[in-house]
Amino acid sequence: MSTFPGSPKLLKGGIVLVDPGSGAVRGAIAFQYNPETLSRSFQVQAAGGEGGDRSQALRVKGPAVESYKLDVVVSAADQLEHPSENPTAVEHGILPQLSLLESLVQPSSAQLISNNALADSGALEILPMETPLPLLVWGRSRIAPVRVTDLSITEEAFDPLLHPIQAKVSLGLRVLSVDDLGFSHKGGSLFMAYLQQKEQLAKRIPAASLSVFGLGGLP
């Protein structure tokens, strides 16, 4: 895809995987093409529930549960135009990229083997397997710790050996807050930075005057 001379470089969105303990980067998945749309929703954590307790009407228990939904396209078309420079795409199509995305939603084979060995040895307690912490990166102002809640892959084109060469990937992500991770967890501190960035951006908008609503004051 050509660009106009002098046009600003388009940043890529994607997912960065970090070690939940040390915070060290363990991998990164850059979207080949940025999604055209990004849907977000918020579930308010109201303190009063539906009971009608008047003292709780404006209270919240914690951060709203924020969710993202996005669709990304993965294609080998550009790579297959230059087969000598892209032997992996020629041999496997986009299976490596899809496999990397699938690794976000399941434990590794090494973790499964390790837990099975613990079970065979008679271990009384086997902890659930911990995956790397995914961070949704959408520009410098939005870096959020997330959990993948939904992954759907529609393979749309194949090579003669049935390797997929184009697919649409639908991702559902839930932002992990300090309610999920705690303040001492690396993800908790990343969430606080994400929330504080939003607060700083909100302060850039001046408060509207009541006159714009046709009001001279409140009743």
Where are these regions (language model features)?
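Acidic, Ser/Thr- and Gly-enriched intrinsically disordered low-complexity segments
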Residues: 1-219
